[in-house]
Curated annotation (Swiss-Prot):
It is found in: Cytoplasm, Nucleoid. May be involved in recombination. It comes from Enterobacter sp. (strain 638). Pfam families: RdgC (PF04381). This is Recombination-associated protein RdgC. GO terms for cellular component: bacterial nucleoid; cytoplasm. Keywords: Cytoplasm, DNA recombination. It comes from the Bacteria. The lineage of its organism: Bacteria, Pseudomonadati, Pseudomonadota, Gammaproteobacteria, Enterobacterales.
Amino acid sequence: MLWFKNLMVYRLSREVSLQAEEMEKQLAAYTFTPCGSQDMAKTGWVAPMGSQSDALTHTTNGQIILCARKEEKILPSPVVKQALEAKIFKLEAEQGRKLKKTEKDSLKDEVLHSLLPRAFSRFNQTMMWIDTVNDLIMVDCASAKKAEDTLALLRKSLGSLPVVPLTMENPIELTLTEWVRSGSPAQGFQLLDEAELKAILEDGGVIRAKKQDLVCDEIAVHIEAGKLVTKLALDWQQRIQFVMCDDGSIKRLKFCDELRDQNEDIEREDVSGRFDADFILMTGELAALIKNLVEGLGGEAQR
């Protein structure tokens, strides 16, 4: 089981049926296939349990996990530039004239196509968790762009996917700033030793504090000067540590050893049993964390 490292959280904006059996058929039409000789990138679904199962969905207690794989061809720009310059030089010498910009652009496409079959590939996988009980979708990635790309694949697979980023009633940075200013985060949370503060004005500067007590005169001065806390490291019930960001993303999730070792009694040979147990454990903990976090941040924005 791959324990999530980050969370981009989305709210299903209207009621939609997400049944694993039906989804399995819909996702099958978009199973991952490797890049062909002229493909720059390919994305598709793979089994979240890897070699242990061919199923593209894994479901327990209303929680569904999916896995998207992306292959990208790597063409270093210096290699492309060198090949293009050589081709331009050769043609200009043969024709005795300078090539036009449109001709050079056309040549660049030719060069790219000629290099693609020899290009190396970079692969990455993105896990997605659908909480059908709470109507939420979580993507395990650190950027909104990557999350949106994964959601776009799911939307294409299902035909429609009405989701919006989970947003709070109050600006998150104002709540985080108050937690640091007062030294009193919401119940169940504890300030750790890392934060980022930004001035309201773009050219007002950024302060990054690491391994530092945040409830101190130095940080207080920055807050009094108008800086807002945009990232804050927190501990939740001594079970999960993470960084809360002002855009609503939850980064650098770290589960305590007690949690991660909770299913150690399951035999190593029982890979699917361990995956299932860890999935139930992780989603249960994260669902509770998200619920507490939303409450602590002042509640979800009214839709």
